[in-house]
Swiss-Prot record:
The lineage of its organism: Viruses, Varidnaviria, Bamfordvirae, Nucleocytoviricota, Pokkesviricetes. It comes from the Viruses. Pfam families: Hydrolase_4. Belongs to the poxviridae K5 protein family. This is Protein K5. Gene3D superfamilies: alpha/beta hydrolase. InterPro entries: AB_hydrolase_fold, Hydrolase_4, MAG_DAG_Lipase.
Length: 136
């Protein structure tokens, strides 16, 4: 959620950041069907405190040691996600997908799918253009 909030803040206040490095931005909700999106919005409005789902610990990291620590960390909320929260996350994600091309703040995005390879991001640092390609 941090990257999503940063993107929304950058859109609302274009001069807020000089540049952004976004870790795992939540901008791809293609896996969610339209019916599920509609159901989430409806449930989020009618029954915002209803439990709707739980975060799969294996989605937190591929490092099983970290997954184990996550599962047994007493400071982490292991309850189900509430409908109101899920609805707001989907709403924010949908907005980000619509506005991301309008944001001029230089950004480097890094997601789990790109662990082995980051391809062709332009990062502008003090009027110096750099192209970053990292390959293993």
């Amino acid at each position: 959620m941090g990257a999503t909030i940063s993107i929304l803040a950058s859109y609302d206040n274009p001069n807020l950041f000089t540049a952004m490095i976004l870790m795992s931005p939540l901008v791809n909700a293609d896996a969610v069907s339209r019916l599920n999106l509609l159901a989430a919005k409806l449930m989020g409005t009618i029954t915002p405190n209803a439990p709707v789902g739980k975060l799969c610990p294996e989605s937190v990291s591929r490092d099983m040691d970290k997954v184990y620590k996550y599962q047994y960390d007493p400071l982490i909320n292991h309850e189900k996600i509430k409908a109101g929260f899920a609805s707001q996350v989907l709403k924010a994600t949908n907005k980000v997908r619509k506005i991301i091309s309008k944001i001029n703040t230089p950004r480097l995005s890094y997601s789990r799918e790109q662990t082995m390879r980051l391809v062709m991001f332009q990062v502008h640092i003090i009027s110096c253009n750099m192209q970053i390609v990292i390959e293993k």
